[in-house]
Each structure stands twice: as C-alpha cells, then as structure tokens.
Regions:
Chain B
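Low-complexity, Gly/Pro
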Residues: 1-8, 250, 254, 301
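Glycan-processing catalytic domains of CAZymes
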Residues: 4-198, 292-293
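Carbohydrate-binding surface patches
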Residues: 150, 154-173, 186, 226-266
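A glycine-rich, often tryptophan-bearing local segment used as a flexible ligand/cofactor-contacting loop or short
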Residues: 188-224
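C-terminal beta-strand-rich structural cap/linker in extracellular carbohydrate-active enzymes
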Residues: 192, 287-308
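Solvent-exposed beta-hairpin/edge-strand motifs
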Residues: 259-279
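Extracellular/luminal ectodomains and secreted, surface-exposed scaffolds of diverse proteins
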Residues: 278-288
Length: 333, 308
C-alpha cells in the first residue's frame, strides 16, 4: 500500500446490483461491476490481464472480508464469489485461496462456502468456542502499546496472513463506525488483522486515530495487500459497525476499486458524511460531549469519533488524502 | 523427603461420614483431615491417611474464581479475580482454610501450593476428583523453590496496602513483602512514602499502575499475553525457573493458547498441566534476553520448568 495507483478510485454503480427489500445481491450485476471496475482501474482491455496485474497463479491469496455486522451487513458473498471466479480464471487454484476474518461466529453466519467452489478455505483466527485465543495469531509479529494501562499490551497479526498469504485482497464494506468514524479499507486491514484491538476503546475515548494506521503499516500486511475492493452495495450511516438498527442502513449500489486505502477511505468518509447530512445527523467530525449517549438516536454516539485516522494514515505513507490529488472515475452500468 | 512434601501439599478437609471413604478413594483421594470430633470414627477407614483438623486460628480464604459482573456498571471491563495470593503473602506462617465447592477445589489447592500456603480445602463430592488431580500433579512436580520477585513492597498492614498488593498479584507484577528496601529487588515500594503516598491508594489500580510504570514492562521477569483471568508466578529452580499459571476461570472455561515471556535464556522446558494432555510448548523462542513460548491449553493450573 498504496500500490501502483495512489490516489486513484474507481466507482462502479449498478441499480440492479442489490435488492433493497431482501438485501440479496445480484450475482450477474456484481460480475459485470467487478469486470468494469478492474478494467477502469488498470486500463487493461481484458479482465484476465487486469487481475494478473496483481495476482499470479503461484500466489496464495487471502481475501479479507468484513463480517462485523453479519449477517445483516457484511462483505456480500456474491462479491467474494465474483473475486474468486476471477482468481481461478487466471489460474489460481481454489486451494490457494482463503476467505478470512478474525471471529468465526461472525464469519460463519454468512455461510460463504455455499457461494464458493470446493477447495476455497474459509477460516477465522478465533474459533466459535475459543474467542480471545492467541493461537490464530503470529507470536512474532505484533504492535506493542498501552492505551489504558492494560496488562496485555500486544496486538498480534493473524497467523495465516503472516505465514501463508503472498497476496491479500481487502474487501471491506461501507460503514460508519462509532469509534473510528468510518470502517473502510484501513480499519478492515488493521483491526481486522490483529488481535486484542478492542482495548483501544474505553468509555467515550478511542485511540483509533493513530492505531489504525500504525497497524495497517505493519509488514507484511502493508506490502502484501495489493488490491482494495470496497463493497458499497449496502452501507451503514450510523451505529456501525454492527448495524443493529435497519433504519441506519442505505444502499449506494456501488463497488469501488483501488490500491490506495487512504484515497478509498476518504471517499467513504465523504459518502457517509453526505448521507448523514441528508438525514439531519451531526457530522462524523462532531466532538461535542453532549452528543455522547445511546446511538439509537442518530445524533448520539458512544464515542468521540476519530475520522482523522485516515489523514493520519496518509502521513504514514499509506496513501493520498488530499482531495485535490484524488482522481475518481465513475462508471455507470 | 516424601513426608515433607506430603506435609506441604494442601489437605482435603472432609466433613462427610466414614461411609464416604470409598467415594474418596474412587476419586483418587489418599489423605484427608476430618473434624476432631469425627476422628475416632474415621481411624478405621482403610486406604486413607486421616488426620484430625485443627481449624482454630486458621484464616478463612475466599473461594477463588472470577466475577464477571457483566450487568454491573464499572470503571473497567477487566474481569474481577477473587484471589487469595495477597493474603497468603501477608501471612507466610499462617494456616488457611478454603471453602471451595466443585471444580474450584482444584484452583484452591493450586493457588495454595503456588503461593506456599499451609492450607486445607473444604469441598463437596463434585470437588473430590478435581482436587485429587491437582494433588497428583503437585506430587509429580515436587516442591517449589523460593519465589522470584521484582518488587519489594514495604507493607504497613492497612487494608489500603492490602488492596494494592492484591492488584499487584492480580496484574502479574511479581511482588515480595519486605521489612526494609531489599537491594536484590528491581524496585522497592514503601507504602506511605513520599513516592507512594497513602492518599494515592484511594485509587488502588492507579497506584498498582504507577508501580508498574516505575518498574517498566521491560524489566518484568514474567509477562503473559492472551488472558485477563490468569495469574502467573515464578519460583526459582536449581538450573532455571518454574513458571506457574493459574486460570481463575478454570472451573468454567479452559484457555486456548497463552503466550508467556520470561526474562533470561532457557532453551530447555518441561510442561506439567493438570487435566491437559502432555504437550509441547508452541512457538518457543530464546532471544538475547528472554524466553517466550505459547502453552496450547490451560485448564486450571500448569507448571513450566525452564532450564538453561
């Protein structure tokens, strides 16, 4: 990161990509969106060549999904299936593809295997009955810091990401986050790849401002994450990431493509901020203590949000934050 | 030597009638204390070593475990451990009694042994087998050496100081109570001194955190990663150290994976864990100044002997 296309974001919209009533994605529309997005991002004429810009048949590929609001909101299995279809089409064996998350209960609630060819692995770092285990993490790769005086000061990298993958495709979805402001590419690759991160929030204070970028910059995550595909078919504009309240969901019906997580997340910030404004909710940047409280109310939140984490990540060299330097290309299907 | 070891092991305090002897033997119990009034009737029970209990003057300890208090608002989400280590440290020559039903009998026996207490554990029928398993393990590992400590704590005997000692133990800060500053310690804490005033103990976690800050994590002889319900201790051994891991939630839930860091280079190791299969330590590494490893499973109690 930020890869070969710093500052570039391709947004593909298809009105038929998701049914708002059933929340089911349309696999054919998603396939077309994936092809259109990859061609627009790379400038290639054939989709196989576009995918080969990032992945070779020898690679062991981790697809980092986001299931923290599953099954209500998550990386759609149709999107993951479409990515896998393209990977196998360029010669990556199914057995060299992993769909992964940190928590098995969330991952399993989506039932990804039902959408994927035999042989693709679906794996969580922490099992259904062993939440909190360190066994799924690499003991040698960690960020050590103390936020609130906790005794366990380490956050370790997911073991399969450290030891097995040669490439990672990051596939978050478009959500507001009550601590970080939004949870997009950066947070999915950071908090979604390291253990013991919830310790960075306590009462209304969260250290996401600097911790997200710090984790995302850790090797080998930084260099192996070669492609960002934002699932913005559905989104959450308040009370994320878990989306317990359906009234705060919305449907951009888009997929975004890039290699620069900062540029992508700046776009996400704009998307969620615009939706909040349209709904009459306070800005993500609001820091008023009087707006702390039960987030059933769109003007209240459990934390003082830290949307500045995206700009902070840009200062670590993870991508382009300056809006004037971000080139957005929009594709309508 | 065997007699000495047996005397050092926690005893089972059993107030059931003599016709329960077979139940005890089946559970693996070999030695019991009974109320003095029942001693005569128990003398003829075969297959068990029976002593008369003398509870007068013994200190009653709490049943060890974890209180999650999920429905109670609090300043911390860290589970509250009910541990007795600090009370044992304060009374090194004391005699103690636990009332620990069920699987907590195992934790009580392990805690008593780990902190070097002369203790009897009163339990129920469900606690017999877990207790016997721990006693069998304690016999197998042999006696502990003297405790290894980083912090010398000059205790004024007050409840406030007691709570600070409790939190130091609970936070795995290896503490030894001393009468005056001990030059062998990395840090000496005089409770009530200008540096550690009594007023600060009004917020005991803050004081414990302050002490940790003075010591620094880098100088801690022992650290653990991956659980908020484990208390770790370190005792010296002829050619290394012995790591003790007590899972205070062990009566309800085992821990899958716990990372341990011990200062010093120890290329050799041996694990003994009650109720878990014999297992190799995972991801073992010996760096320039520390040894690290992961224990795959921790039920109630595990001991890792590390040697040079």
């Amino acid at each position: 990161m930020p890869g070969p296309f710093p500052g570039r974001v391709v947004k593909v919209h298809s009105a038929r990509s998701i049914d708002e009533e059933s929340r089911a994605a349309n696999p054919d529309a998603v396939r077309q969106m994936l092809t259109a997005g990859m061609l627009a991002l790379t400038g290639e004429k054939r989709k196989e060549d576009a995918w080969r810009r990032f992945i070779s048949p020898r690679d062991v590929v981790g697809i980092k999904v986001n299931c923290s609001g599953a099954p209500q909101i998550c990386t759609h299995p149709e999107v993951v299936a479409g990515i896998v279809e393209n990977l196998t089409a360029i010669g990556v064996p199914a057995s060299q593809i992993w769909v992964y998350e940190r928590f098995a209960n969330q991952l399993n609630s989506v039932n990804y295997p039902r959408y994927l060819p035999d042989g693709v692995h679906v794996e969580a770092a922490e099992g259904e009955y062993s939440r909190g285990t360190v066994l799924g993490y690499d003991p040698r790769t960690y960020v050590e810091t103390s936020f609130f005086g906790e005794d366990d000061t380490r956050s370790n990298l997911v073991r399969i990401a450290a030891e097995r993958f040669t490439k990672i495709i990051n596939v978050p979805n478009s959500k507001e986050h009550q601590a970080a402001g939004v949870t997009g590419c950066l947070k999915n690759i950071a908090y979604g790849n390291f253990s013991n991160v919830a310790r960075s929030h306590k009462s209304s204070k969260t250290f996401t401002y600097s911790f997200i970028g710090t984790l995302a910059a850790v090797e080998p995550i930084r260099s192996r994450t070669v492609l960002q595909i934002m699932d913005a078919l559905a989104g959450v504009w308040h009370a994320g990431p878990f989306s317990r309240f359906p009234q705060f969901r919305f449907y951009p019906k888009q997929l975004w493509f890039g290699t620069d997580p900062v540029a992508m997340d700046h776009q996400l910030l704009d998307l969620v901020e615009a939706k909040r404004k349209a709904e009459g909710a306070v800005s993500l940047f609001d820091r008023s203590p009087e707006h702390l409280g039960n987030n059933r109310d769109p003007n209240r939140n459990a934390f003082i949000r830290e949307p500045g984490h995206i700009e902070y990540a840009s200062r670590l060299g993870l991508g382009v934050f300056d809006a004037a330097k971000i080139q957005v290309r929009e594709v309508e299907l | 030597m065997l007699l000495l070891l047996a005397a050092a092991l926690p005893s089972l305090l059993w107030d059931g009638p003599p016709d329960t002897a077979a139940t005890l033997r089946q559970a693996g119990i070999e030695r019991i204390q009974v109320p003095a009034a029942q001693y005569e009737s128990w003398k003829s029970a075969g297959g068990l070593a029976v002593e008369a209990a003398h509870p007068d003057g013994a200190i009653q300890l709490s049943s060890p475990g974890v209180q999650y208090r999920a429905n109670v608002a609090s300043a911390t989400t860290t589970p509250w451990l009910v541990g007795n280590g600090w009370r044992i440290l304060r009374n090194p020559r004391g005699r103690f009694i636990y009332d620990a039903p069920g699987a907590k009998a195992a934790l009580a026996a392990a805690e008593a042994s780990c902190f070097g207490a002369d203790a009897a554990v009163h339990t129920d029928a469900a606690g017999l087998k877990p207790f016997a398993e721990i006693i069998s393990m304690l016999r197998a590992i042999g006696p502990n050496g003297p405790p290894v400590a980083d912090i010398g704590f000059i205790d004024d005997g007050s409840p406030a100081a007691g709570e600070v000692i409790n939190l130091l133990v609970r936070d795995n800060l290896l503490v030894k109570l001393v009468a005056k500053p001990d030059p062998a310690m990395k840090l000496n804490v005089a409770f009530g001194s200008k540096e550690f005033p009594k007023e600060e103990a009004g917020n005991p976690p803050m004081m414990a955190h302050d002490i940790r800050g003075h010591l620094t994590d880098e100088r801690r002889s022992l650290r653990i990663f991956g659980s908020a319900v484990v208390v770790a201790r370190l005792t010296a051994a002829p050619d290394g150290v012995r790591v003790h891991l007590l899972n205070y939630a062990g009566a309800e839930r085992k821990i899958d994976g716990l990372r341990v860091r011990v200062l010093g280079r120890y290329p050799k190791s041996h694990v003994t864990a009650a109720g878990s299969p014999a297992d190799e330590l995972l991801d073992y590494s010996v760096d320039t100044d520390a040894t690290e490893f992961t224990i795959r499973e921790l039920k109630t109690y595990a001991v890792i002997d590390l040697a040079r």
